[in-house]
Structures are given as C-alpha cells and as structure tokens.
Regions:
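Short cysteine/histidine-rich zinc-coordinating motifs and their immediately flanking basic loops
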Residues: 76-89, 119, 123-127
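Local cysteine-cluster metal-coordination motifs and their immediate loop/turn environment
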Residues: 5, 19-23, 62-74, 106-117
Length: 375
C-alpha cells in the first residue's frame, strides 16, 4: 500500500501539530516531535518518522495512526482519505504539497455531530451542558501565514478548514493572503450559510467548495444548528453558476439523520456534484447501535430506496459506487449490529443536554428521531 499524503500532505491540526492528513491519529510523542514551530516543513516528508510509516504501509501493514482509513477500506468502500488522495494527487511531482490549514475555529453553527475543537459554538454549548470544560479545548488560531513563504511555490492545493471559513476572521485573513501569494487550487468546507462572493469572483485559480449538508429543510435546521435552510439552499444553487468553482457535498451520517439522508440524495440527484462524500462521527453513541430494532425497518427502506435511485441515475461510476457502498454499509450495520441500550441512553442524554442549552426541542424538528429516542 501507498499513501500520497505521506509524500505530499501537510496538515496543521487544532493544536498546531503537523501531520500528513486530516484524519491522522497521533499520540503525545508525535505531538511533541511535530509542533509547527519546531520542524522544517520543507524537509518534513523525508524525516525518519514519516519514512518509517511509509515503509510499514509498503508492507501492507496498517499503522495505528491510519485507523480511520483502515475502518473505511475494510468494508470495501473506496472513499477513504488514502484512496481519494491516490486519485486526486496522482499527477503530483516530488515537490508538490497539499496544505491543510485551520486558521481558526470560530463558527456560526453548532452542528450536533461536530466537536469542540472545530467550532467555538459547539465548545460553548457543551461547556454549558457540563459535557466539557472549555478551558481544556486546545484549538489555536493562526493569523500570520508568512511561515509558508519559504515553500509557497510548492503548494499546489490547499484545504481550508474552520470553524466556518467565510465567518472566522483568521480564515478570511488566509483567503486574502492566498489571493496575494498563492497560485494553488483551494478547497474549503463550508456550512453554506454565507459565501464571500467577492473572493469567489476574484480568486484567479480553481476553487472547490464542499457544502456540508446532512438533511434538508426543518431537520437540517436542528441537525446543523444555526441553519436557515432557505439561505443555505440559495447559496448552494448560486455557487453552481461559477465555472471555476467545483461543487462537492459532504454528508455526515449518524443516528440524527439516517432517516433524512434520502432527502439529501433526492436533492443531489437533480445535478450530482463532482464528489459526494460520506462522513461518520467517531462517537459510538451517534451510530447505528443506538437505533432500536423497531425503528430500523423504516430507515433501511429509505436507504434502499436511495440506493436504487443512485444506481439508476447516470453518475460517474466511481462516485456511484462510493455512494452506494456508503449507504449499503449503514444498511448492513442496521441489519446485523445489535441494539445497545446503554449507547441509546447516552445518545438520549446528549440530545436532552443539547436541547436544554440551545433552548430547542428535537420534537419540533425531527419527529422520527424524537420518537426513536422515546422507545
């Protein structure tokens, strides 16, 4: 096995630890040795620790840090970060770099499946609910990007994360810095609530905008708390008018939205984006095991319906297979994994805690999930 990110990836995490990709799992030893301010980014891919990981993969042995991709690929899915990188960066030369950078974590949403380091609002609400102590959230911002200048000509692609890139002030600073210094393709993940249209129009190089959409309409306004669906949908439609912008969509599948994924699929089937990816939260209490047996048939039926629609629509074959495999893996899990009452109660308490501090009620937005929690 080989991973392009071990040759070309530079991902700067919340705590300014450098790693090959966004899903790289690291321990305290890696964090100590790979702090942004103490390594040479220009030669980092030739370091002993990175070469050791390359050699292990070459022996078809999965490093523990690659757990995320292993869990996806073992199910037969072809949309892991590693496999996506093999396709996306196939033409990279030895010096080309993909930079993933998170200048800040300020966000105007508090999505139910998000985590404190990625959203200041999530951190605030979870702190209010007593789930975390906000003082323990290690999410550092970056406001000066000139440290990238020594190898700026090697940066071929940038993945910009937040917070919300069009809301966080340091992300906006990076966009302005990029317009002045970079000739790279820029990919950014957005909640779709606000787009800086002047930057979209004026950036002289290719742009990829990844909309995070987990549901449509009223359920979206609960699951991705902060959403005004009409605004997100309008921006989703508007971005497709720009020829230099590639549209992608990421769907995070969880117990919150298994039943609502069909609505997102129906929306996308009108004009399937270049890439549709499916994310999975890391917490077991957001997964299939929390779904009571009596609620599973309805979800399976809706997902199977979506699978058949995808199969019968003329979509690029690889994308079609990835979408089918992602949904089929949920169906298989619902049909084989036993219900876990302890996890169900943990999910129920999490929902209650979030509803309390956000002053909302899931019953008003997601009746199926509310009824599922009442079982």
């Amino acid at each position: 096995m080989h991973c392009k990110f071990l040759d070309h990836g530079v991902a700067i995490s919340y705590d300014q630890v450098v790693k090959p990709c966004c899903v790289w799992k690291y321990d305290s030893s890696w964090a100590t040795q790979n702090q942004l301010g103490s390594i040479n980014l220009d030669t980092w891919h030739q370091s002993d620790q990175v070469i050791k990981i390359k050699n292990q993969l070459a022996q078809d042995s999965w490093p523990s840090s690659c757990e995320h991709c292993y869990n996806i690929e073992k199910t037969g899915r072809g949309d892991s970060i590693r496999l996506n990188g093999a396709q996306s960066y196939a033409e990279y030369s030895g010096d080309d770099i993909t930079l993933e950078i998170r200048p800040g974590a300020v966000c105007n949403f508090a999505c139910q499946t998000c985590w404190p380091e990625a959203s200041t609002r999530v951190a605030q609400f979870q702190h209010q609910a007593g789930i975390i102590d906000i003082k323990d959230v290690n999410s550092q911002s970056i406001s000066n990007f000139d440290f990238l200048l020594p190898f700026v000509n090697r940066i071929r692609n940038v993945v910009l994360l937040g917070g919300e890139p069009f809301y966080d002030k340091n992300c906006l600073k990076f966009l302005d810095w990029a317009a002045e210094h970079l000739s790279a393709n820029i990919t950014m993940f957005t909640n779709g609530s606000m787009i800086r249209w002047d930057w979209i129009k004026n950036y002289q190089h290719p742009i990829t905008v990844v909309f995070s959409i987990d549901a449509v309409g009223t359920p979206a306004e609960y699951i991705r708390y902060g959403t005004e669906w009409d605004t997100v949908y309008q921006n989703f439609q508007e971005i497709q008018k720009y020829n230099h912008v590639e549209l992608r969509v990421n769907i995070t599948t969880s117990a919150y939205n298994y039943i609502y994924v069909q609505d997102v699929v129906d929306l996308l089937l009108v004009k399937w984006p270049s890439v549709v990816s499916f994310g999975v939260p890391g917490d077991a209490y957001l997964g299939t095991q929390v779904v009571p047996d009596q609620c599973r048939a309805d979800i399976v039926t809706s997902l199977n319906r979506s699978i058949e629609k995808i199969k019968s629509t003329p979509i690029e074959l690889g994308q079609q297979q990835n979408a089918v495999n992602a949904l089929q893996s949920i169906v298989d899990a619902l049909e084989t994994n036993n219900y876990d009452h302890v996890l169900h109660q943990k999910f129920k308490k999490f929902v209650q805690d979030m509803d309390r501090v956000k002053k909302i009620n899931i019953q008003d937005y997601c009746k199926f999930v509310a009824n599922m929690l009442a079982q």
